[in-house]
Design a protein with these regions (language model features):
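Acidic (Asp/Glu)-rich catalytic clusters
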Residues: 34, 62-70, 99-109, 157-167, ...
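Glycoside hydrolase catalytic-domain groove-lining segments
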Residues: 108, 227, 231-290
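N-terminal module-boundary/linker segments of secreted carbohydrate-active enzymes
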Residues: 7-76, 80, 89-92
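Conserved, mostly hydrophobic/aromatic
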Residues: 75, 172, 241-243
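Aromatic-lined carbohydrate-recognition surfaces of secreted/lumenal glycan-active proteins
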Residues: 43-46, 169-176, 199-229, 279-292
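Substrate-binding cleft of extracellular glycoside hydrolase catalytic domains
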Residues: 80, 84-208, 212
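Alpha-helical scaffolding within the catalytic cores
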Residues: 28, 55-64, 96-100, 155-156, ...
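C-terminal motif of bacterial Sec signal peptides marking the signal peptidase cleavage site
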Residues: 2-3
Length: 301
């Protein structure tokens, strides 16, 4: 099953769920994802049901559906803001509405991704000489506050249920692009070792303390071209289900998109090899182009 009648062939990867206590629903979800790999590529769109080109909060509407007749197979929502107790996420979408959208996507046999990349800098005391990740890992007040963040995330995940009261399986995309300096957990702010510790601590807390077992975890890197780069921050097979590439067509001198396409092919090849070797699901987790720079971006690039 794929969106927009996309039928490109994809290698069949044998992969295993990282959570040893995965719910029955999550195991079924994984089986469905595996079968879809054989069918083609699932196209995704962020905030697809909430707003689009010249519209906002119109039930049943989607830009992707308007273009090709089908809803996107994958819909991504940002959980940013939930850690502070906000009723709105960072894109000003109410969390109660995101919960409704997740259920709608589930009923259509689609896939939901929940991206969570919290601002950790607010956890750091002004007089602290540590970086924020090291502060969270050290077990002081920052750790306590961070666990409160996770408590709020867990409450939201717990409420994601279908009409039968069963948990809806979702993908949580954590701490993306650690090889970028712009992230609190990124290069220059956090060592690869501390990044791995933060990731594992986060997943362990959600699984073991909050009993969350209907989630797959996605790990992603920006613009990589080799398996060695992926390995540098990789949290380990027991903590990751999906290995992804993030890459935007953001090159001022790349008007044709040829450089983007070259880097995309190299990155996806590396991701696919790494995923196959580690029995994980490969994905292009984040991509796009700001504005309509290339008219055939989706059809040819």
């Amino acid at each position: 099953l794929s969106a927009c009648n996309e039928t490109k062939s994809v290698t069949n990867f044998a992969w295993t769920v990282s959570d040893e206590r995965a719910s029955a629903e999550l195991k079924d979800f994984c089986h469905n994802l595996t079968s879809r790999l054989e069918a083609g590529i699932m196209l995704g769109h962020k905030d697809a049901l909430a707003y689009g080109s010249m519209w906002y909060n119109q039930p049943g509407r989607s830009d992707v559906k308007s273009v090709c007749g089908n809803y996107p197979a994958v819909v991504d929502w940002d959980l940013g803001g939930i850690e502070s107790g906000s009723e709105l996420n960072v894109d000003s979408i109410p969390f109660f509405r995101i919960r409704q959208y997740v259920e709608q996507v589930y009923r259509r046999n689609g896939v939901t991704i929940l991206s969570w990349n919290p601002s950790l800098s607010s956890l750091l005391r002004k007089d602290s000489l540590q970086n924020v990740v090291r502060s969270v890992l050290s077990g002081n007040e920052s750790r306590v506050e961070y666990e409160q963040y996770l408590d709020r995330v867990a409450v939201f995940l717990e409420t994601l249920k279908n009409s039968d009261g069963r948990h809806i399986p979702v993908i949580v995309h954590l701490f993306h692009s650690p090889n970028l300096a712009s992230m609190d957990w990124g290069m220059g702010h956090c060592s690869p070792e501390d990044y791995v510790r933060l990731w594992r601590m986060t997943v362990d807390y959600l699984r073991n303390k909050k009993n969350i077992h209907h989630v797959l975890y996605a790990y992603s890197m920006y613009g990589i071209v080799s398996e060695e780069e992926i390995s540098q921050y990789y949290p380990g097979d027991k903590y990751v289900d999906i290995v992804g590439l993030n890459l935007y067509q953001d090159f001022e001198s790349d008007e044709s998109g040829s450089l983007y396409k070259q880097r995309l092919n190299m990155g996806l090849s590396a991701i696919s090899r790494f995923a196959e070797a580690n029995k994980k699901l490969p994905a292009l987790t984040d991509t796009g182009s700001k504005g309509v720079k290339i008219s055939n971006f989706f059809s040819s690039i």
